[in-house]
């Protein structure tokens, strides 16, 4: 597992770094996509080389289909995920115009990049929760869920709060000199970041359901989320445009988050829903306070590369300090358990 996690993390980090360099040196969507595609092409090549070097595979062994008896439920889950990922662009393409799609795509490049970084950072944790569930060790499982939730909240609220402050200035830099449409869309940028954050905070509970082989039980909620997203987006896109489709995504993500927190409380003895919502409330208050403080004390108005970097450093220090204070005051057990986990 560490080879996969390490490779994925490096690819994502290099993708973000090279994308930033490309934006400042030669801002072209074609170059950006070429860099991204080239880096991700390396991933299967690295895995293939590692497997051939370290494992002997007998390709003549008869398949055991009982091992994938839940495959159609898995297909349904992935179909729902595909609908989630493509709804906004599809609705905008058919019911808005290509200029609006262009705005969405540029902002989405940033939010998706941050999401990939967080996914890569978390990829090595999910299997530990699955191991504890398989052993039916509820005390260990609750401890690991606590630390999993804590790490997710720290990463999501730190990175996405900073992103919410910087995404629109970044897009203004990226699209400087382009006058075909108005790329300065701060409210849309904020709501897009919020929707991605809501998608990520449920990951501990979603991955627990996957590990527990509960694909059938979570299929219907996945489709309800997709339906809410589509219906609300279609209803609001004509009047609100980008904001409308983002509201649809936020409503769908909120429903799915609430369901998975509830479902975890049903399959894990002693796992009260308030544990999650307490973390959500505290980190949301801290992130909100940090956002307001940064926005008021040091707003980024005259955007240059230098000012963007200076503000990014300032925002990281402020948001990081607030979240650290919240951790010290309210989550000492999680911090200690995480330190022990790292040492092991």
Q: Model segments located where?
A:
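Interhelical loop/hinge segments that connect adjacent transmembrane helices in multipass membrane
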Residues: 26-33, 45-86, 90, 124, ...
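Interfacial segments at transmembrane-helix termini and the short loops linking adjacent helices
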Residues: 166-196, 303
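Membrane-proximal transmembrane or re-entrant/amphipathic helices at the cytosolic face
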Residues: 294-344
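Membrane-embedded alpha-helical segments of multi-pass transporters/permeases
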Residues: 16, 20, 24, 44-49, ...
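Helix-loop junctions and terminal segments of transmembrane helices
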Residues: 111-149, 205-211
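Short runs within selected transmembrane alpha-helices of multi-pass transporters and secretion channels
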Residues: 7-19, 32-48, 77, 81, ...
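Interfacial transmembrane-helix starts/ends
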Residues: 68, 137-154, 158-166, 183-189, ...
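Interfacial/gating helices of multi-pass transporter permease domains
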Residues: 29, 66-74, 92-112, 140, ...
């Amino acid at each position: 597992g560490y080879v996969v996690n390490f490779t994925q993390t490096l690819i994502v980090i290099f993708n973000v770094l090279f994308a930033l360099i490309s934006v400042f040196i030669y801002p072209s969507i074609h170059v950006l996509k070429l860099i991204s595609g080239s880096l991700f092409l390396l991933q299967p090549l690295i895995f293939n080389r590692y497997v051939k070097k370290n494992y002997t595979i007998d390709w003549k062994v008869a398949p055991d289909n009982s091992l994938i008896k839940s495959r159609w439920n898995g297909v349904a889950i992935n179909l729902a995920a595909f609908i989630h990922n493509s709804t906004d662009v599809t609705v905008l393409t058919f019911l808005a115009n290509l200029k609006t799609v262009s705005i969405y795509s540029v902002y989405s490049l940033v939010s998706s990049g941050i999401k990939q970084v967080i996914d890569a950072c978390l990829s090595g944790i999910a299997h530990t929760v699955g191991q504890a569930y398989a052993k039916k060790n509820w005390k260990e499982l609750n401890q690991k869920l606590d630390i999993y939730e804590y790490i997710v909240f720290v990463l999501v609220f730190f990175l996405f709060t900073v992103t919410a402050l910087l995404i629109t200035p970044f897009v203004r830099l990226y699209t400087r000199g382009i006058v075909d449409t108005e790329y300065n869309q701060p409210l849309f940028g904020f709501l897009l970041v919020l929707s991605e954050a809501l998608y990520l905070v449920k990951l501990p509970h979603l991955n627990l359901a996957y590990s527990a082989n509960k694909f059938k039980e979570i299929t219907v909620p996945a489709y309800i989320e997709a339906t809410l997203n589509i219906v609300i987006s279609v209803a609001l896109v004509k009047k609100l445009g980008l904001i409308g489709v983002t509201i649809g995504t936020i409503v769908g993500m909120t429903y799915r988050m609430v369901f998975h927190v509830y479902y975890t409380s049903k399959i894990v003895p002693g796992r009260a829903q308030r544990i999650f919502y307490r973390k959500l409330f505290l980190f949301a208050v801290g992130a909100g306070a940090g956002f307001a403080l940064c926005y008021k004390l040091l707003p980024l108005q005259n955007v240059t590369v230098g000012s963007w970097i200076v503000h990014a450093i300032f925002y990281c220090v402020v948001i990081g300090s607030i979240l650290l204070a919240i951790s010290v005051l309210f989550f000492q057990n999680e911090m200690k358990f995480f330190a022990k986990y790292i040492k092991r």
